[in-house]
A protein has these predicted regions:
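Short helix- or helix-capping micro-motifs
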Residues: 16-19, 108-116, 164, 168
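Specific aromatic-rich, kink-prone transmembrane helix
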Residues: 89-91, 130-149, 159-164, 347-350
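Short acidic/glycine- and proline-prone juxtamembrane loop motifs at membrane-interface regions
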Residues: 117-131
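Transmembrane-lumen/periplasm boundary regions of multi-pass, lipid-linked membrane glycan transferases
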Residues: 166, 178-285, 305-330
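Membrane-interface transmembrane helices that cradle and orient dolichyl/undecaprenyl
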Residues: 97, 103, 138-156, 186
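Transmembrane-helix motifs of polytopic, lipid-linked glycan transferases
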Residues: 79-100, 137, 141
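Membrane-interface alpha helices of multi-pass inner-membrane proteins
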Residues: 47, 108, 155-172, 206-208, ...
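Membrane-proximal, lumen/periplasm-facing interface regions of secretory-pathway glyco-
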Residues: 337, 362-423, 434-437, 441-449, ...
Length: 522
């Protein structure tokens, strides 16, 4: 296999840096702030732990590193998460190179970079960023381990276990990699299965060692992350959906919504390349055996003799299991199209190897990637898409703006800052998680003492668990910052209340109250 030249690698590296710069520019132009979850992760990153109420720790550690290097600005919070998507494309390209040569690598990395999931989620700080990177690393290291021998194979299996473990510490859906591994074990040649099985056991042992601190943290804290995950998956059964409005029609609608969403997040680049390949293979029967055989390298020699799996088999193993689990979950509760994000890696790998086998021109790749990048950029920067379609958004209707929930927080909180600053030394209470985390981020210069309060005393999110307002608190005065006025139960403890200020921007409406046990002395 011909090695890529340094000039080729340099060009690809420059294109990757340009893509990262484009993503940062798109987010800046969008005018969006942090999503509530992003602000929550940022707040968690102030206190590194081996786990959190609803998420494992890798993304939070990533934000800690990002802000340590780039500061606490919006792009500073997002920088390393954005970089994960670019690195994922490189890792996928490296795998495609090992399977089918440089042409396959360029197609794989380019296609993945141009998907809508990379172009839009790539602007956000989500657990999908490190998950996708470690999923790609698991794909690469497993391939390398299975095709190596001796000491090199052992090192690759250890690397595979590290990738798997860190993937699970990014997002629990990485456990679906276990089904991918079983798929590949079953599809491997009979004479190789024992070696692959033993190597897989070594990888599992390494992964367990990686997970031990997180498991110990969960055990010490009564398994909050595991319980939260079960609550939003297993315990929300199909009967819960079926008994709701619409019955089983709602179940089917949820499944259809999820399935259609998977087609959408691949974007036009993937579907254009698929169409061109389908038409090319149909029109040229000389290449009809290329896909089933695997692929041919640039020098024309068959690569299948030393390969344990065909590119199609390998790609399906890393796409179908997580797609199936996502569909099951969609039928059980509701459809979230990002549940199966790593499936895009397998799809792009398959198309890249197919494109290399059929010698699809790089010009077609450029056009396809251009279409994907233009569409994702338009969606990211256009605001309310209804306006572009000549539609008017009524006051009671939602806008077609993917950043709608990220707008208005900073403007509202900055307008409240003068009213809040004199009270920075006393506790600030809120009954709304979004308000708590957005206040912590936007007014971080004030270092507010924020506490979660609710009337039932239950634990519904991380801050009601770790930062609850104690029932026996004796503070003579507190600040209430919330979308709604103070609850009567809270007013019974602090009967002297006066509103200090209010603010509204976009969807965000906030009120600030000073609550006291005794009236202010004149």
């Amino acid at each position: 296999m011909n090695r890529p030249s340094l000039s080729t690698l340099a060009i690809l590296a420059l294109l990757s840096l340009a893509l990262l710069g484009l993503r940062m520019f798109e987010f800046t132009v969008s005018g969006a702030g942090l999503h509530v979850d992003e602000a929550q992760y940022w707040l968690w990153s102030r206190d590194l732990q081996w786990g959190y109420f609803s998420k494992p720790p890798v993304l939070v550690a990533l934000i800690t590193g990002s802000t340590a290097v780039f500061g606490d600005s919006l792009l500073g919070v997002k920088a390393l998460a954005m970089t994960c998507w670019v690195l994922s494309a490189w890792v996928l390209g490296c795998l495609a190179y090992r399977i089918g040569g440089m042409r396959s690598a360029v197609f794989a990395g380019g296609l993945f970079s141009a998907t809508l999931v990379s172009g839009l989620l790539g602007l956000s700080v989500t657990t999908d960023a490190p998950l996708t990177l470690f999923w790609a690393l698991s794909m690469l290291t497993l391939w390398q381990a299975a095709h190596a021998s001796g000491y090199r194979a052992t090192c690759w299996w250890i690397a595979c276990g590290l990738s798997f473990g860190l993937g699970v510490l990014s997002k629990y859906s990485a456990l679906a990699l276990g089904f991918s591994a079983l798929w590949l074990l079953a599809m491997a040649p009979a004479g190789q299965r024992r070696r692959i099985f033993l190597g897989g056991l070594l990888a599992c042992v390494v992964a367990v060692w990686v997970l031990l601190p997180h498991l110990a943290w969960n055990m010490a804290n009564q398994w909050p992350t595991a319980q939260h995950t079960l609550e939003i998956t297993v315990q929300e059964t199909g009967s819960t959906v079926a008994q709701g409005a619409g019955g089983w029609r709602r179940v089917l609608a949820s499944g259809f919504e999820f399935s259609f969403g998977q087609l959408l997040i691949l974007g036009p680049s993937v579907w254009l390349v698929w169409f061109w390949l389908w038409r090319k293979q149909r029109d040229d029967s000389r290449h009809s055996g290329a896909l089933s055989a695997g692929l041919t390298e640039e020098n024309g020699h068959a690569l299948t003799a030393s390969r344990l799996w065909s590119p199609l088999t390998y790609a399906l193993a890393f796409s179908c299991p997580i797609l199936a689990l996502g569909l099951i979950q969609a039928l059980n509760s509701k459809a979230l199209i990002n549940w199966s994000v790593p499936m895009a890696l397998g799809v792009c790998l398959w198309l890249a190897c197919w494109a290399s086998a059929l010698r699809l021109s790089l010009t077609r790749l450029v056009w396809a990637c251009g279409a994907g990048l233009v569409l994702s950029g338009f969606i990211a920067t256009s605001g309310d898409i209804k306006q572009w379609m000549g539609l008017t958004t009524q006051p009671h209707q939602s806008k077609w703006d993917i950043w709608g929930r990220m707008r208005g927080w900073d403007a509202s909180l900055q307008s409240l800052k003068p009213a809040l600053e004199p009270y920075r030394e006393i506790p600030w209470l809120t009954g709304d998680r979004s308000t708590l985390v957005q206040t912590a981020y936007s007014l971080r210069a004030l270092e507010p003492k924020l506490y979660a309060w609710n009337s039932d005393g239950g634990v519904h999110h991380h801050f009601e668990w770790k930062q609850p307002w104690p029932a026996n608190a004796h503070d003579p005065a507190v600040v209430w910052i919330n979308p709604s006025p103070p609850h009567p139960l809270l007013l019974s403890r602090y009967p002297h209340a006066r509103q200090l200020a209010g603010a509204q921007s976009g969807r965000v409406t906030l009120q600030v109250w000073l609550l006291q046990t005794q009236p202010t002395q004149p």
